[in-house]
């Protein structure tokens, strides 16, 4: 006689109604093993590190720990978000596939610029947006907002959460002031890490604030740029500065509106003075 063992895997409730084990078959299963989501970020990081395809051929990959934390935090935040369908859930496959996409985008950038080190950035997480939306089912409210909008908000909130673990006590006023004075910087894949680093070094006090991430003068450009972008993304997440979709960092929108309003008010005052002077001159000519 043959000894046959059957192992079945199914979600308790699947939105497609195809994943449930039929009752006659379930009655013949000896044991039911109930699993659960990772209980904390570090447990999720360990699972993702074990399962994700991270070892690439001919690539010197270095994944900063804060990138791992943000990716896991996205899953944790999505599980608590009211706009995400709790019945379908958010499985550990989300951070696993996201990590693979993040590494792939970083690897593409390194190959494009012939760089030795592959170091993922926060921008690579946003580049993985299509993969994240494919792993999440939304409630009605989320559908009305749009999947991309909901996921961007979750990523932004996740960056803010992890940012606070490193920079909660960091004074960023000097950096904010640089942007308030009209400074802008763009970080994208179009230029190598050395070029991005040269632009970032122009921001007063930025590189010096990266101490919590163990960045120093000997750190390679790829790692330094990734850390600096994380700090800027955290400031953007807390609305201390602004960022456009083209990844151009500028002054906070409120500061920009205040500046525009002040400039407008100044122009109006100048026009009033010109009108008063014109009226006075016209009056004088009338009496001559």
Short names for language-model regions:
Residues 1-59, 104-112:
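Canonical AAA+ ATPase core
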Residues 3, 15-26, 38-45, 61-72, ...:
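Amphipathic alpha-helical transducer elements in NTP-driven molecular machines
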Residues 5, 9-13, 86, 116, ...:
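Generic preference for well-ordered secondary structure
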Residues 20-21, 26, 30, 34, ...:
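Signal for well-folded cores of large energy- and translation-related assemblies
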Residues 27-30, 42, 46, 50, ...:
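Short, surface-exposed, charged/polar-biased interaction segments
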Residues 44-119:
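Conserved AAA+ ATPase small/helical "lid" subdomain
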Residues 107-288:
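C-terminal engagement/docking regions of AAA+ P-loop ATPases
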């Amino acid at each position: 006689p043959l000894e046959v063992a059957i192992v079945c895997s199914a979600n308790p409730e699947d939105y497609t109604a195809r994943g449930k084990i039929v009752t006659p078959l379930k009655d013949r299963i000896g044991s039911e093993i109930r699993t659960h989501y990772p209980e904390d970020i570090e447990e999720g990081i360990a699972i993702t590190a074990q399962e994700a395809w991270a070892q690439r051929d001919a690539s010197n990959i270095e994944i900063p720990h804060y990138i791992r934390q943000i990716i896991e935090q996205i899953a944790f935040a999505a599980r608590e978000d009211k706009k995400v369908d709790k019945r379908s859930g958010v499985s550990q496959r989300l951070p696993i596939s996201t990590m693979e996409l993040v590494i792939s985008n970083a690897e593409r950038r390194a190959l494009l610029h012939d760089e030795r080190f592959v170091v993922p950035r926060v921008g690579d997480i946003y580049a993985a947006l299509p993969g994240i939306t494919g792993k999440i089912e939304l409630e009605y409210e989320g559908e009305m907002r749009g999947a991309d909008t909901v996921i961007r908000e979750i990523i932004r909130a996740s960056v803010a959460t992890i940012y606070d673990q490193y920079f909660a006590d960091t004074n960023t006023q000097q950096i904010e002031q640089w942007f308030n004075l009209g400074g802008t910087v763009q970080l994208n894949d179009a230029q190598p890490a050395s070029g991005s680093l040269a632009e970032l070094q122009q921001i007063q006090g930025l590189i010096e604030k990266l101490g919590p991430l163990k960045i120093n003068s000997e750190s390679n450009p790829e790692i330094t740029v990734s850390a600096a972008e994380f700090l800027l993304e955290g400031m953007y997440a807390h609305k201390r500065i602004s960022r456009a979709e083209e990844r151009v960092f500028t002054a906070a929108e409120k500061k920009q509106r205040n500046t525009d309003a002040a400039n407008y008010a100044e122009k109006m005052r100048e026009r009033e003075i010109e009108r008063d002077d014109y009226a006075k001159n016209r009056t004088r000519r009338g009496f001559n």
